Curated annotation (Swiss-Prot):
Keyword Cytoplasm in record: yes
Protein name, UniProt field: Co-chaperonin GroES
Transmembrane segment boundaries: none
Gene3D superfamilies: GroES chaperonin
Family statement: Belongs to the GroES chaperonin family.
Source species taxonomy: Bacteria, Pseudomonadati, Pseudomonadota, Gammaproteobacteria, Enterobacterales
Keyword Transferase: no
Function: Together with the chaperonin GroEL, plays an essential role in assisting protein folding. The GroEL-GroES system forms a nano-cage that allows encapsulation of the non-native substrate proteins and provides a physical environment optimized to promote and accelerate protein folding. GroES binds to the apical surface of the GroEL ring, thereby capping the opening of the GroEL channel.
Gene Ontology CC annotations of this record: cytoplasm
Length: 97
């Protein structure tokens, strides 16, 4: 992938959702839903604070994150794969093992 996000933006590859219910029923279409988890594939340089300082992002490439797919989320196809471009503030949590 040849794309570099700017400022406090993050590029995420959405993780696949489990397509079976707890009872073993295969879910399809909208019933399966879309995952709000993904892997960070690229990060911007950081956010410029009011005093002009650059604050590095808290997430890094390879982090598994839970995100809010709000109005600011942009879905982009890159090399025939779907990625989300979000601001770091759209990320709700980092999943730690």
């Amino acid at each position: 992938m040849n794309i570099r996000p700017l400022h406090d933006r993050v590029i995420i590859k959405r993780q696949e959702v489990e397509s079976k219910s707890a009872g073993g029923i295969v879910l399809t279409g909208s019933a399966a839903g879309k995952s709000t988890r993904g892997i960070v594939t690229a990060v911007g340089n950081g956010r410029v604070l009011d005093n002009g300082e650059l604050k590095a992002l808290d997430v890094k490439i390879g982090d598994t994150v839970i995100f809010s797919e709000g109005y600011g989320a942009k879905i982009e196809k890159i090399d025939n794969e779907e990625f989300l471009i979000l601001t770091e503030s759209d990320i709700l949590a980092v999943v730690e093992d």
